[in-house]
Amino acid sequence: MSKEQLKKYGTTFHFASQFLSAKHIESAANLYAICRQIDDIADTSDDKEQAKHDLLVLKQALIDEDASHPIVEAAKSIEPAICLETLVELTDGVLSDTGSVRLHSEPELMRYCYQVAGTVGLLMCDLFEITNPIARHHAVDLGVAMQLTNICRDVLEDAENGRVYLPETLIGPMSASEVAGATGANADRIRDVVNYLLTEADVRYESGVSGLCFLPTQPRLAILVAALSYREIGMIVADRGFDIWAGRAFTSKTQKLLIAFKGVMTFFFSRRLHVYQGAHDSSLHRGLLRRPGVHWA
């Protein structure tokens, strides 16, 4: 993946990557390209049955470590090596996006967030050669936090495409069209749930940041800036009163510069970014079952 493609398709990642070394940028960009290709199978195909078939073929190729599949070949060429089992989990998560989506429960939502984003945290650990189980638990939390932010930002866009990630147990039996056009009590309920999920994301951002001390110095700063950037999107949604119908939340260039400044200041003056000061909360992984990087207690 070229730097221009990275800038176009992964703006937050491109911004944070400015704090990485050239070696880490190349590896991370190649990993991003693989994740993007997997995601695009579900998102860009008009034939959802064909997309599902292609993802199932990819999943089996990953399980078999069959390098004749171009995505598996690309994954196996990344150095340091990444875990193909983690990519299987990612592919399973993307498979659930082939068609309409209606999540029933909060544990189901958290499993989805783990599969499509917690796995990315684990793959980044692979790139930085982080094997400490505690560090990897925190990496899962950061990925889940970012995905919860994405979901809260994109409620309207997803609903217009037949996807509702807000759990039925929280918002009630609303259809995608009812979410997109919600008014009155239904709109209030959606705002309350978005507020709740962003609060859950904040807990996981805190956990994710507390695990950054396990990373090498340069990646530590880069991932901190990425975390602050995503978290800022949630703050923008909150500042709008959790009005998900008010347009897509994004950070301006000025906000990005302020985030970078905050990241650098935090990096230099926050002890927890350099010394591990706590223990991982296994309750954050409740319902994720026995999967790579999950804190099973």
Go through the PLM ranges and name each one.
Residues M1-M146, C152, E157-A297:
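Catalytic cores of Mg2+-dependent Asp-rich isoprenoid enzymes
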